[in-house]
Amino acid sequence: MENFKVKAELEINVTQEDVDDIVTTALEGGINYWCRKAEVVGDYLGEYASEQISRGGTLKLYDSDGDKVHELTRDKLLDGIKKYCEDTERPYDIMYAGVNSVGCSTGEYGLDCCMVDATVADMIIQYAVMGEIVYD
């Protein structure tokens, strides 16, 4: 019997809290080996720098390798999440499928940020600001 592959595109619901959690994890240890400094652009939009992105702000990330400066925005972070989820060699699956009261799929997907450790947050940020994994 012959098998066939079909490529499907999923839509993933990402909450403001998910964005805050990913950026917090990245800033508190995920990206510290290649990012020497993170700086809020403009006014703080939340209490912490990690809340800047989910509220539509920008963070400047200063690369420890030379004079490179990367700007992280919400759109870039969402693209980084997309690229991470498409990476077939990703260390963890961070998506979950929504189910109804009888256990059937609702066709909706979300992020399980309990699966986003420093490695995953780093990969998402690298995909977001560099388009690929540069440092590992």
Language model regions located:
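Acidic, low-complexity, intrinsically disordered interaction modules
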Residues: 74-80, 91, 95, 101-108
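Short interaction-hotspot residues at assembly and binding interfaces
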Residues: 36, 45, 101-107, 116
